[in-house]
UniProtKB/Swiss-Prot annotation:
It comes from the Eukaryota. Belongs to the Mediator complex subunit 12 family. GO terms for biological process: regulation of transcription by RNA polymerase II. It comes from Aspergillus oryzae (strain ATCC 42149 / RIB 40) (Yellow koji mold). Residues 81-93, 1499-1521 have a biased composition (Low complexity). GO terms for molecular function: transcription coregulator activity. Component of the srb8-11 complex, which itself associates with the Mediator complex. It is found in: Nucleus. InterPro entries: Mediator_Med12. This is Mediator of RNA polymerase II transcription subunit 12. Residues 1-116, 1499-1532 are annotated as: Disordered. Keywords: Activator, Nucleus, Repressor, Transcription, Transcription regulation. GO terms for cellular component: mediator complex. Component of the srb8-11 complex. The srb8-11 complex is a regulatory module of the Mediator complex which is itself involved in regulation of basal and activated RNA polymerase II-dependent transcription. The srb8-11 complex may be involved in the transcriptional repression of a subset of genes regulated by Mediator. It may inhibit the association of the Mediator complex with RNA polymerase II to form the holoenzyme complex.
Length: 1594
């Protein structure tokens, strides 16, 4: 038969409906028999919608193939609609009605429905897995290319009883183009029987007789023309009488009917016996013969010719064609696919039968057969790789289509080792380069169902598709890959929507979840729900890696984190909105804000102004801020550790801006009242004397004074304090306040800590005085007229004052330093910002540089206030004004650049300033040396009284300077700096400024001399680096980080370190260099000292770890150095002060470093750190050794602010030398704290446990492992026991991150035993319940039923709890232990068996399937705008846990579990062939099949039984102790190597009364068509007598 070129191929994924043969029943011959891999290609008499296009491989389209039309039989009640062909590789999930197949049936091919009763396995059609796989001849291809259609004979007329006439308006005409296209044959035309012709017995067709010229019907004469042609029936005249008389007498008799029945029964029995096939199977594969090369080629050419029957070719199959050579011959000769498969079967059957003929045993023959099939599969793989590797060659598309079709046909004919082939396919897809991936994706559509049948392959496919998608979506990939991206996205989408369980990826979900979400349409509710469900399932299998993931931050902790972030982000608006969203209760929010501003565990004034800005914003948004502040003041305790000065500062700022209602506060205070007791004054009353009164209305001020008097606080003290401070300040600044205070007596302030009422009044008074201190003011003109001293001693260094603007500020550097020191001492930075704004109008470059340094020092505060940008703009304008006059200095430029670098929006301005700085330096460096410098080296000396004058003359001459002159000046200045005193009377700061002005003349030479001088200074033992370096750091010649780096490099070299005489002194100098100066020593006296202070702050913020290293190195010298010299600096005190700053500036980072590298490094460092912590926590470290009460006190005082410090303190107590008793006690304290905090729904214990060492965490964790003590025969279902267990399990969940990666090996056997115990209890409960249902009576039954219901809920809780423990300790089951356990594989198998049996048990209340994980699991924090689905059933989660274990377990554990479920399944598990079992446990390996299946080559199935293979769960409670022998069924090894329609069902068959209930496995290699020249009675590969088959007679 010539296959029709336009006939479509029926999809394998959809079964055809049964055919009605007209008599109302389905023909059995059409339903019985092995499945056909492809339908016959039959010509269709009706026009098709589209002709078949030329064969192409297109990766961007997914058009379906035209399906073969069937004759319209009578429609049955269940009829599936037509669906697109499954051969299309498009993975679109919504493609027309695609069915989700179940394992065992999803990938099967439909039975062949032959309309002529042909053998069910037809080989006349090619397997076409790709669109357009049929090959057209040249003429048709040319016709199609030219736009025409290939010629075809006219269609047969439609039979009148099959179709009704079409309506007139439907399609009156049918064009020739729409007629079916047929290939032009190269052999003589042969009549083809229409597919719609009625079929009779014996391959006869009714009413079809093609014209041949000699039929009576073809003879045209007068009679046939008039009457037509008809067949006359020959009526026999032999029967003259009827049988009625003879039969009537017999039927009339009483026993006649019985006799008639016996006769008919005997007739039917005879008929049945004679019709049965009783002859033994005479099937033999076609023999092979030895042929010459020419004959072999001729035979292959005949095989390629479809007109040569296979029965003829089966007589002379040549030797020597096998393996890859066979496939290459089929490809090169163009042998049709079905005939190529026939040849492969013939060769394979002979090869396999040869093993038995060699006299080998059955087991050995099975092994040899399995090996041969694997080798044959490898040959097919090499064949496909070879064709794929020839990409780009001539006719590659045709060859590739043929190779894909042939290999797919071999695969679905079960002629390959499925496991090996699909594993190779996935490995090839994974290793394929991007340009070859489309071809593999095309083939993926063919094997999709077989790959997704088992998790072992489905998970691997999901991961490699995601990896490929991530690879092609890299930013460097261009637009040409977009079709490939779309195709991969479609596959991923299909995976998620149709095979969700294969996308449960515990190990890689975090890496791929964003990519998966991008492939879905999350606006679609279906996609969104599935993705949320998948995300929740994966999150249940995740193990937290650190405590941040486990410890879910409370709203209060998140708000504190937002407060802390403002210091670096400076975004008040966003932080304000985020805070309001985080905590809805405004009272809690404002209370937490005020605590944050006043806590001793934070540093700096920035938090004060942050609180002010936030409160102002919230006030403007309508929040009653005043009430919440007053409530906080009423609730705060007098003994609280809060710094109430900051609270009063905030309220004072709010009063200044008229945000806080003073009148309302006074009314509230009067209504509240105060107690007349000698106790400390409460905070709400202390606020009364802190309120600024200068801007209050008169009546409010009077009321305030009255309340002060009633409270016993004299009002005159405030007035006298203000007066004293004004007099003191006026004496320091006579040019500003001299006229007002000329008559005042010199005095000092008697109040070291003035109230904010006093500070606010003084601040406004100073601001008013600075505003009036201008060059055109009468006071300044009068003072200038009385002054006789020159304005500047050294104009180059102190600045140039040029009165270009009469309204410019007349501030001098000393006046500015004094004002700045006063306001910084007060902490009134908002008033300082106003004064700095006025100072920017000054024309003194030193004052302007000091203003810039001040803004840089308080940068965070001024950013929060909002004054930084205006101040920087004003400074730049003043610099531009001085630049136009030619009076800009290096000091101002340096300060502006340092400030501008911290303002992101001013980078362009900084670039211009750097250009000016470079221009000034180049101007000095490129200038020619002046004649004055020739005589300077001889005369210039630091002992010369006129040294400063000569130096000024040299630096201001405008000329250059050669290296010798610079050397002389440099070493002279350094000599002054080292001696700290000389006849020149230059201070260290002035000397450093001269050095800064000297550097631009020769920058490189200056830096070289400076490094050489510092190295020489390190080798000497006399000078102190902490005294010499600050001035150099202040002027910018040296940086702290550069000096620390230099010292580290020098100390790393042993030769250099040996030269340095005093290493201990150097480490101490480094520590003293970082310690801020104490107040009272005029620390901000001038420009240089202030800049050094700014440099210290910058080093603390940018290099905290290096600072801690310096402290640790210095305090290690305390034991050997202290006490020997009274002048020795207090190293421990300096270190403690510095540690306090570092701990409060960045608590989390500093505490983490102290835990890792500071504690235990040296005993002295631990002591110093303990002293610093005691200062912060308020402990007295001198009270004695650590005690348990101290540890309990630390735990009790833990809150959101002190948490890091309490962690550090507890760790130090745990590591204390006093011993292990204290250490164990600390663990006990932390254990109790964890239990109490968890019971009260708190989470602080997670925080202070989180940062501690792993030893402490594991000890606390072991304390909570009480689930190990679950008694075997107790009743754990009580409410109290469940609550306690839930409490401990929650703590274990929080500490899960402490489990090491290698796992805790001792936990694995315990969990296995607990799961076995749980299964044992389940079996006992089920047995008891079955007994109760059989003997149901009275109240006892009701009580037992209630007990059973309670037990089921308890079972669900413990099952979910143990599942979580298994997830946490998953690595303990897979990681190799130091001492390998002999029963490790058995533990893995037993664990899988327990999980699967419990999860799929059919309990009366269905609690396992409906109970959502016992409401135990903590849900992750909502992210990406949605909340994960909380309704994941416990059964689903249990199967996910089993899947995650199977992913990591060896195949042996999976196979042992499968054998147990097949042979020893518990009695309440009645469905071993559950699709979920098959999905998780498949596929079976060769060894498992060999152990459980009989040799295929045996002539008949064995009737005897054998003892089943013992499994690790043979002693499992509930399993039968003496299982029934397993009946073995005939099978073949290739049945285990392939996965046909019944393969999985045959692996997991139901064992019932010693018999294996399952399908009869067939031998695919022997399913041969036309195997022998002469057809015998039982010439089939399957022995028909085993099935009571009957002969079909024509």
């Amino acid at each position: 038969m010539i296959p029709h070129s336009s006939a479509g191929v029926q999809s394998w994924g959809h079964p055809l409906r049964a055919v009605n043969n007209g008599s109302g029943h389905v023909d059995a011959s059409q339903a019985v028999g092995p499945p056909d891999p492809q339908f016959e290609k039959l010509p269709t008499p009706v026009p098709q919608p589209q002709p078949r296009q030329p064969a192409v491989i297109d990766l961007t389209t997914s058009g379906g193939d035209a399906q073969e039309l069937e004759p319209p039989p009578k429609r049955l009640r269940l009829d599936l609609p037509a669906a697109p062909s499954a051969r299309d590789a498009s993975p679109a999930p919504g493609s027309g009605g695609e069915l989700r197949s179940t394992p065992g049936t999803g990938g099967s091919k439909p039975p062949s429905l032959s309309w002529r009763n042909r053998p069910v396995w037809s080989f006349q059609a090619m397997l076409s897995e790709v669109p357009g796989s049929n090959v057209m001849n040249e003429e048709d291809a040319t016709a199609v290319a030219q736009g025409g259609k290939p010629a075809s004979p006219p269609s047969l007329p439609v039979l009148p009883w099959k179709y009704i006439p079409e309506s007139l308006g439907s399609n009156p005409t049918t064009s020739r183009a729409s007629s079916p296209v047929k290939e032009v044959q190269t052999i003589p035309y042969r009549i083809e029987t229409p597919s719609v012709a009625p079929v009779l017995k014996g391959e006869k067709v009714a009413d079809f007789s093609p014209w041949i010229g000699n039929h009576p019907e073809d003879v045209l004469n007068e009679q046939t023309a008039k009457q037509g042609h008809y067949d006359r029936t020959q009526v026999s005249q032999n029967e003259s009488n009827t049988a009625r008389p003879s039969l009537y007498a017999q039927l009339k008799h009483r026993s006649g009917l019985q006799m008639l029945s016996s006769v008919f029964a005997a007739a039917l029995e005879k008929r049945q016996n004679h019709s049965l096939v009783t002859a033994p199977s005479t099937f033999k594969p076609p023999p092979r013969v030895t042929l010459t090369d020419n004959k072999r080629e001729a035979w292959l050419r005949d095989l390629a010719n479809p007109s040569v029957p296979l029965r003829k070719l089966s007589r002379t199959i040549p030797h020597g064609i096998r393996g890859k050579a066979l496939l290459d011959q089929c490809l090169n000769k163009g042998i049709p696919v079905n005939r190529a498969v026939w040849l492969a079967k013939c060769v394979g059957a002979n090869e396999i039968r040869a093993f038995k003929r060699k006299g080998t045993s059955g087991t050995l023959a099975l092994g040899l057969e399995a090996k041969w099939v694997r080798d044959w599969t490898a040959s097919v793989q090499q064949f496909l790789e070879g064709v794929l590797g020839a990409c780009g060659s001539a006719q590659w598309k045709m060859k590739m289509t043929y190779a894909v079709s042939l290999t797919a046909r071999l695969f679905f004919e079960r002629l390959l080792d499925h496991d090996q082939y699909l594993g190779w396919f996935l490995s090839s897809l994974e290793a394929a380069p991007v340009n070859i991936v489309p071809v593999w994706l095309l083939m993926l559509g063919i094997y999709w169902d077989n790959i997704m049948r088992y998790r072992k392959r489905g998970r691997r496919l999901a991961e490699l598709l995601l990896v490929k998608l991530r690879q092609v979506t890299q930013p460097d990939k261009g637009g040409p890959l977009q079709p490939l991206v779309d195709r991969l996205s479609l596959y991923v989408r299909r995976l998620v929507l149709e095979h969700t369980s294969s996308v449960v990826l515990p190990g890689s979900w975090e890496n791929h979840k964003e990519l998966i979400s991008s492939c879905l349409n999350l606006k679609d509710n279906v996609h969104k729900t599935i993705y949320q469900n998948l995300s929740e399932r994966n999150s249940r299998l995740q193990l937290p890696k650190n405590h941040q993931d486990t410890a879910e931050r409370s709203p209060q902790q998140r708000v504190i984190q937002l407060f802390d972030s403002i210091r670096s982000a400076h975004d008040i608006s966003s932080a304000s909105t985020a805070c309001l969203k985080t905590i809805e209760d405004k009272a809690i929010l404002i209370s937490k804000l005020l605590e944050w501003t006043a806590t001793p565990f934070r540093y700096g004034l920035c938090r004060v102004y942050t609180g002010v800005r936030l409160l102002r914003k919230w006030k403007m948004s309508g929040i009653d801020v005043d009430s919440y502040i007053l409530s906080f003041l009423a609730d705060v305790r007098v003994t609280s550790a809060l710094n109430m000065e900051n609270i009063y500062h905030i309220i004072s700022e709010l009063v200044r801006s008229q945000t806080f209602s003073v009148g309302r506060y006074l009314q509230w205070l009067m209504a509240k009242g105060v107690t007349n007791t000698p106790q400390p004054v409460p905070s709400d009353l202390c606020l009364l004397k802190q309120l600024p009164a200068n801007r209050l209305p008169e009546h409010v001020r009077n009321l305030r004074n009255t309340l002060l008097y009633r409270a016993g606080i004299p009002v005159m003290e405030e007035d006298s304090a203000i007066a004293e401070l004004k007099i003191s300040i006026a004496q320091r600044l006579p040019n500003i306040f001299g006229a007002e205070m000329d008559s005042a007596m010199p005095t000092e302030s008697s109040q070291p800590h003035p109230t904010w009422a006093v500070k606010s009044e003084i601040g406004q008074w100073i601001r008013h005085g600075i505003a009036g201190h201008c060059r055109d003011s009468p006071r300044y003109v009068y003072l200038l007229s009385r002054s006789t001293a020159p304005a500047n001693n050294y104009r180059k260094l102190s600045g140039v004052s040029v009165a270009v603007d009469p309204g410019a500020s007349a501030l001098t550097p000393d006046e500015f330093y004094s004002v700045r020191e006063i306001l910084e001492t007060f902490g009134d930075l908002s008033m300082l910002a106003d004064i700095l704004k006025q100072a920017t109008r000054c024309d003194d470059d030193v004052v302007l540089a000091s203003v810039a340094d001040t803004v840089n020092c308080h940068f965070d505060c001024f950013c929060v206030i909002g004054a930084t940008a205006d101040l920087f703009r004003g400074l730049v304008e003043s610099y531009a004004r001085l630049k136009r006059l030619g009076n800009a200095s290096l000091d101002l430029l340096f300060s502006l650049i340092e400030l501008g670098l911290r303002i992101p929006s001013e980078f362009n301005t900084v670039a211009l300033l750097r250009q000016d700085l470079t221009r000034l330096e180049n101007k000095s460096a490129l200038a020619a040396p002046s004649p004055l410098s020739d005589s300077i080296p001889l005369a210039l000396s630091d002992v010369d009284p006129s040294f400063q004058e000569k130096l000024n003359q040299l630096l201001s001459s405008g000329g250059g300077m050669d290296e010798s002159t610079m050397d002389t000046v440099f070493y002279s200045l350094m000599h002054i700096l080292e001696n700290s005193g000389s006849p020149a009377k230059l201070s260290a700061n002035e000397t450093a400024r001269y050095l800064a002005y000297l550097r631009p003349f020769q920058p490189k030479h200056f830096d070289t001399m400076l490094i050489r001088w510092i190295c020489g200074l390190l080798k000497s033992s006399t000078p102190s680096m902490s005294r010499i370096l600050p001035p150099l750091i202040g002027v910018g010649c040296v940086t702290i980080h550069a000096f620390v780096f230099l010292v580290k490099k020098l100390l790393q070299s042993e030769k250099v370190a040996a030269v340095i005489p005093n290493l201990a002194g150097l480490r101490v100098d480094l520590l003293q260099l970082l310690v801020p100066l104490v107040s009272g020593k005029s620390k901000y006296a001038d420009l240089v000292t202030y800049r050094f202070h700014v440099a210290q702050q910058e080093f603390f913020m940018k290099h905290p770890q290096e600072t801690l290293d310096i402290i640790c190195d210095a305090v290690a010298l305390v034991n050997s150095e202290t006490g020997s010299n009274p002048g020795q600096p207090d190293i421990a005190g300096c270190a403690t002060e510095l540690l306090d700053i570092l701990l409060t500036q960045n608590p989390e980072v500093t505490v983490q470093y102290c835990l890792q590298g500071f504690i235990g490094k040296h005993s002295t460092s631990t002591t110093v750190l303990e002293r610093a912590l005691d200062n912060l926590l308020g402990f007295d470290s001198l009270a004695g050794p650590p005690t348990m009460s101290e540890a309990e006190k630390v735990v009790r005082m833990t809150d959101d602010f002190s948490l890091p410090f309490c962690q550090l303190k507890l760790q130090m107590l745990f590591n204390a030398e006093s011993g292990r008793n204290v250490g164990n006690g600390i663990v006990d304290v932390m254990f109790k704290a964890a239990v109490e905090d968890t019971r009260s729904k708190g989470s602080n214990w997670v925080g202070f446990v989180g940062l501690m060492s792993q030893d402490i965490i594991r000890q606390v964790w072991k304390h909570h492992y009480h689930y190990k003590n679950l008694e075997a025969h107790g009743h754990p279902g009580t409410a109290k026991s469940l609550e306690t267990a839930k409490l401990y399990l929650t703590i274990i969940e929080k500490l899960a991150y402490s489990v090491p990666e290698a796992g805790v090996q001792s936990v694995a056997p315990i969990l296995v035993e607990k799961m076995d115990l749980l299964l044992h209890r389940l079996v006992i409960m089920q047995t008891n319940f079955n007994n109760v249902t059989m003997n149901r009576h009275g109240a006892a039954t009701t009580q037992i039923l209630q007990s059973r219901s309670n037990f089921e809920r308890s079972l669900a809780f413990w099952f979910s709890a143990f599942l979580r423990m298994i997830v946490i300790h998953r690595s303990a089951f897979t990681m190799p232990s130091p001492a390998p356990r002999a029963n490790g594989l058995q533990e893995q198998s037993r664990l899988l068996i327990s999980i699967l049996c419990i999860s799929l048990a059919r309990l009366p209340d269905s609690v396992i399937r409906l109970f959502p994980a016992a409401d135990y699991f903590p849900h992750p924090i909502p992210s990406q705008g949605y909340r994960p689905c909380p309704g994941i059933l416990l059964q689903t989660h249990a199967l996910d846990v089993a899947a995650s274990l199977i992913d990591t377990f060896p195949d042996e554990a999976r196979q042992q579990c499968a054998r147990f479920l097949k042979e020893k399944c518990p009695p309440f598990l009645q469905y071993q062939n559950d699709s979920r079992f098959i999905y998780l446990l498949g596929p079976m390996s060769d060894a498992a099949a060999l152990n459980s299946l009989q040799a295929a080559s045996l002539p008949s199935p064995a009737a005897g039984g054998s003892t089943p293979t013992p499994t690790p769960s043979s002693a499992l409670p509930g399993a039968p102790s003496n299982p029934q022998p397993t009946a073995m069924t005939p099978a073949v090894t290739s049945a285990s190597l392939s996965e046909g329609i019944n393969c999985v069902a045959s692996h997991l068959r139901l064992q019932y009364r010693g018999r294996a209930m399952g399908p009869y496995p067939v031998r695919p290699w022997e399913l041969l068509e036309d195997a022998a020249p002469i057809v015998g009675v039982n010439d089939t590969a399957v022995n028909l007598k085993y099935f009571d088959a009957r002969r079909v007679r024509a």
